């Protein structure tokens, strides 16, 4: 006879099924809809039904869950359990919850999907029960359901969790935990449930990380020796770190947490603990700023644990066990923190990262030795055998990305020989170059549907490019020599294919890329080939400059239609893509990667054209049309909204044509101040009799070496209440200082940009070096931008620091006189105020420029009253000094602010909006309008108060815009009586907007 589980015969199953329905029939009731539902409040009947369900389920396992009897019974079983749980009879709900757990483990999620909402609704209220035998199985059952909830149902499930205050209940349970009152298992299951909720629903995270009591409990629990408690806490921290605000909160108080995390990553910890430790570190490193914050606290120990995890593993019967593979994958993901600059790079080399990476490429690497005296030809032959063996293919892309990032961030003086890692590094370079060469040879055969192969091709190609561009002369030259050797056979033939493919894209008339992976490999290949002189000459003869320029122009026209360029495995899993509240610095090769690779190739060709023997006059002697087109396109990219990588390389190439730096709006404003001597307080006198007028505060920030020693810093500051008397200090310059070179240096100091003729270049370089103008010197020397460098800002906000505040010549006073906890670090004044500089204020505001020049009494006072709140004044000052208006709190911080706090934020922007009209600052007014409307988009309930506020300032454009945001909720506002507070004119305005919204199909 057939059996279902453990010897249970069909007859026995039928008997239990009969008993099940005998019990269920005691509670079936016919409802109004004439539908049969299970409804019985009798505790004994409920207990009998639960036991009958349990006995019936004992006959089955997940493998036999397709049995007709169980499939036909699911609806009735689920209905009975939902009602019993909903009745909240403590004597039976614990038993029922345990049966739900067994049901979930046996029946596939696809079959139980229809009942998930009802089960969630019945289980959630029971979590607040203090009975261990009730709350524990309810937490386990609810977690099992939530893990398998379909994305289409997530909104409905969250509504139930929110209504039942599920997060509040679980947080409360965790807060009362102690080893004496509740078991470790209880804490683990509650923590696991909360972790699952935070993974799926970002809305839940704020109430967790913003709960100091809970965070204190977690810190206390994490210090206990029980590994089960530690792993549960790690899971909670990991889910919490999906929120950027939560991650920062963890890091702000993070030393104990980080110590625990790294301790769990050690070899002595359990596999589960090690994986959770690695995952937490990855999530804390989601953003550049947060990653560096973590690294500054535990750099060496974090890197040591990561590298040792990557290098210490073993094969079982020639294979890597699944749990070891999972551990290696997580360690490799964490090692991708090498994509950012920082002190951690030193420790990766210290702990022999090359050796660890090579062990993931070469099978039985530790039992082999690399002969340091073999020829490059022999090394390539060995590398071919290694790549053909295809050892651990799923990790290969991580290997190439990690070594590529390490190479890109090396220092110029880096020398692997001294670090004892030369042989391993050399062999990795050879393997990467060989893998890249194979990708180029594949040409049209590259298949982007094969994700593993595609990611290998892309990441190896990019790694070689990073090696070639490495600041380390050792790595860069090694990569070039190796690649040149490997490309000798069939090099020009393969290159010709790349040229043809790349020239086809802009000439095809299409607006999408024909093959994303092939385009990536082609562009990276173009850049790598261009770095080798003989191939650069070949490309130039094939009109490579024109082809790349055409591609850049095509990209500019079609960038909205171009998708991602990466097939490499991401450090983020599907759940980690549910991050919130993160402000992440873009990776260089994430945004506009195709454009970046094209510009890298263009940079190599331009460099070769200027310095190559055969093409020394390539650009200067050709028709001016190419040069003009090239410079125009590069300026558009440099000044556009593209990624930092393309903008940096556009600026780098422009340096060959005499254009240095980046044009900023703030820089243009400051240049106006430089050209206007009205506010200058220092004059540089030259031996020739000429002079240059400057502003001490700007020079102190941007080029302090030009200041007399006593002017650079001031130990204390006092603000005079007397009328300001401007004095001009005269400084005699050495006769050795070239006037034009110094003027160009000053232009760059003020604006961040300068155009220099070749005749002045040689004199400007030593001056820039002496004055420590690093960015300018880098461009004058035509050094490649360092991978990952951000666009240099004009750091005028430094003028507001205590060290330089003695240059302040005006105080801004808000309309508020009492601000809680106000304390000025700059002076002894106790009322709210902000120190500032007339030159900065007048450069950004025509009204203030005219006021300070008017000769009226106000123009001489050291105080200027500004009709905005203290919060508004801080935002206004920030705009003057950075040309950026600070944004209000974002993400879950904004969503969880009360209405009053949100209105305070909005009021500051409305005040500045009104002031900017009076002070004739159209750009600032537009910025304010954008922020205000963005806030109303996410909180339409603020529209009425915003309308009232804007109307009080007679800001009718803003009133109209706010009315449009209130239009979708007009009927709700009318019924609630909120419109009764407004004037009839304003109500009519909202009503009209609502009618228009309705007519447009809203």
From Swiss-Prot:
This is BTB/POZ domain-containing protein At1g04390. Keywords: Repeat, Ubl conjugation pathway. It comes from the Eukaryota. Gene3D superfamilies: Potassium Channel Kv1.1, Chain A. PROSITE patterns: BTB. InterPro entries: ARM-type_fold (IPR016024), At1g04390-like (IPR044953), BTB/POZ_dom (IPR000210), SKP1/BTB/POZ_sf (IPR011333). Residues 680-758, 808-889 form the BTB domain.
């Amino acid at each position: 006879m057939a059996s279902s589980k453990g010897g249970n015969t069909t007859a026995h199953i039928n008997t239990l099924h009969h008993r099940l329905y005998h019990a269920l029939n005691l509670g079936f009731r016919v409802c109004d809809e004439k539908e049969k539902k299970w409804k019985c409040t009798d505790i004994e009947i409920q207990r009998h039904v639960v036991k009958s369900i349990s006995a019936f389920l004992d006959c089955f396992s997940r493998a036999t869950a397709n049995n007709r009897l169980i499939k036909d019974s699911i609806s009735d079983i689920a209905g009975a359990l939902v009602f019993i749980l909903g009745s909240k009879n403590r004597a039976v709900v614990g038993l029922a919850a345990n049966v739900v757990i067994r049901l979930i483990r046996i029946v596939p999620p696809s079959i139980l999907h229809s009942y998930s909402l009802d089960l969630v609704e019945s289980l959630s209220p029971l979590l607040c029960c203090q009975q261990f035998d009730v709350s524990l199985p309810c937490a386990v059952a609810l977690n099992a359901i939530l893990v398998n909830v379909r994305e289409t149902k997530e909104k409905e499930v969250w509504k139930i969790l929110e209504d039942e205050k599920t997060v509040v209940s679980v947080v409360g349970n965790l807060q009362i935990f102690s080893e004496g009152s509740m078991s470790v298992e209880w804490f683990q299951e509650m923590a696991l449930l909360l972790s699952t909720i935070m993974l799926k629903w970002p809305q839940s995270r704020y109430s967790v990380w913003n709960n100091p009591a809970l965070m204190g409990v977690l810190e206390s629990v994490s210090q206990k020796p029980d590994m089960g408690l530690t792993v549960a806490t790690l899971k909670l921290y990991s889910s919490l770190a999906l929120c950027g605000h939560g991650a920062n909160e963890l890091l702000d108080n993070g030393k104990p947490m980080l110590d625990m995390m790294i301790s769990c990553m050690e070899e002595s910890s359990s596999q589960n603990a090690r994986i959770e430790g690695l995952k937490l570190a990855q999530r804390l490193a989601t953003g550049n700023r947060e990653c560096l914050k973590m690294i500054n606290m535990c750099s060496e120990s974090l890197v040591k644990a990561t590298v040792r995890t990557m290098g210490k593993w073993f094969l079982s019967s020639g294979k890597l066990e699944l749990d070891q593979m999972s551990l290696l994958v997580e360690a490799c993901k964490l090692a991708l923190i090498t994509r950012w600059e920082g002190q951690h790079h030193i420790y990766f080399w210290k702990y022999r990262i090359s050796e660890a990476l090579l062990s993931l490429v070469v099978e039985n690497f530790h039992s082999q030795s690399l002969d340091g005296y073999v020829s490059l030809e022999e090394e390539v032959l060995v590398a071919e055998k290694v790549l053909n063996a295809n050892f651990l293919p799923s990790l290969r892309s991580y290997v190439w990305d990690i070594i590529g990032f390490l190479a890109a961030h090396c220092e110029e003086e880096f020398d692997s020989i001294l670090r004892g890692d030369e042989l391993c590094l050399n062999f990795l370079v050879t393997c990467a170059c060989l893998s890249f060469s194979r990708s180029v040879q594949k040409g049209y055969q590259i298949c982007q549907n094969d994700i593993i192969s595609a990611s290998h091709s892309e990441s190896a190609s990019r790694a070689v490019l990073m090696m070639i561009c490495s600041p380390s002369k050792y790595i860069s030259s090694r990569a070039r020599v190796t690649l040149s050797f490997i490309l000798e056979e069939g090099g020009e033939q393969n290159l010709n294919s790349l040229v043809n493919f790349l020239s086809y894209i802009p000439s095809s008339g299409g607006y999408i890329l024909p093959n994303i992976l092939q385009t990536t490999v082609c562009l990276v290949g173009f850049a790598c080939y261009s770095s080798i002189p003989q191939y650069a000459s070949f490309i130039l003869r094939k009109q490579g400059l024109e082809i790349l320029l055409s591609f850049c122009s095509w990209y500019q026209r079609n960038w909205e239609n171009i998708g991602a360029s990466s097939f490499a495995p991401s450090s983020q899993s599907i759940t980690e893509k549910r991050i919130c509240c993160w402000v992440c610095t873009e990776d260089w090769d994430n945004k506009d990667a195709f454009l970046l690779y094209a510009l890298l190739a263009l940079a190599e060709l331009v460099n070769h054209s200027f310095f190559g023997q055969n093409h020394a006059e390539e650009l200067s002697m050709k028709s001016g049309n190419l040069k003009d087109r090239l410079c125009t396109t590069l300026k558009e990219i440099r000044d556009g909204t593209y990624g930092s990588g393309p903008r940096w390389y556009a600026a780098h190439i422009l340096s060959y044509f005499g254009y240095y730096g980046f044009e900023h709006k703030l820089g243009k404003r400051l240049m106006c101040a430089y050209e206007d001597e009205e506010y200058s307080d220092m004059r540089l006198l030259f031996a020739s009799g000429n002079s240059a007028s400057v502003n001490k505060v700007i020079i102190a920030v941007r080029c302090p070496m030009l200041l007399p020693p006593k002017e650079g810093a001031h130990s204390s500051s006092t603000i005079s209440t007397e009328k300001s008397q401007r004095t001009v200090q005269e400084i005699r310059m050495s006769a050795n200082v070239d006037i034009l070179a110094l003027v160009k240096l000053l232009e760059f100091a003020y604006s961040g940009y300068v155009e220099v003729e070749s005749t002045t270049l040689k004199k400007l370089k030593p001056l820039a070096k002496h004055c420590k103008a690093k960015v300018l010197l880098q461009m004058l020397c035509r050094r490649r931008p360092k991978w990952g460098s951000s666009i240099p800002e004009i750091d005028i906000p430094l003028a507001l620091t205590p060290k330089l505040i003695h240059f302040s010549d005006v105080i801004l006073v808000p309309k508020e006189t009492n601000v809680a906890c106000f304390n000025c670090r700059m002076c002894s004044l106790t009322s709210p105020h902000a120190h500032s500089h007339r030159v900065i204020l007048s450069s950004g505001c025509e009204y203030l420029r005219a006021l300070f020049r008017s000769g009226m009494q106000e123009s001489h006072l050291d105080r200027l009253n500004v009709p905005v709140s203290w919060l508004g004044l801080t935002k206004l000052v920030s705009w003057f000094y950075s040309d950026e208006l600070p944004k209000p709190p974002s993400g879950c911080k904004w969503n969880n602010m009360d209405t009053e706090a949100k209105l305070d934020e909005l009021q500051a922007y409305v005040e500045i909006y009104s002031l900017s009209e009076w002070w004739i600052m159209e750009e600032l007014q537009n910025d304010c309008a954008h922020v205000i409307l963005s806030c109303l988009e996410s909180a339409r309930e603020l529209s009425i108060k915003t309308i009232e506020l804007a109307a009080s300032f007679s800001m009718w454009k803003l009133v109209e815009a706010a009315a449009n945001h209130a239009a979708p909720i007009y009927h709700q506002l009318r019924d609630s009586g909120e419109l009764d507070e407004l004037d009839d004119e304003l109500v009519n305005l909202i009503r009209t907007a609502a009618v228009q919204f309705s007519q447009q199909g809203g």
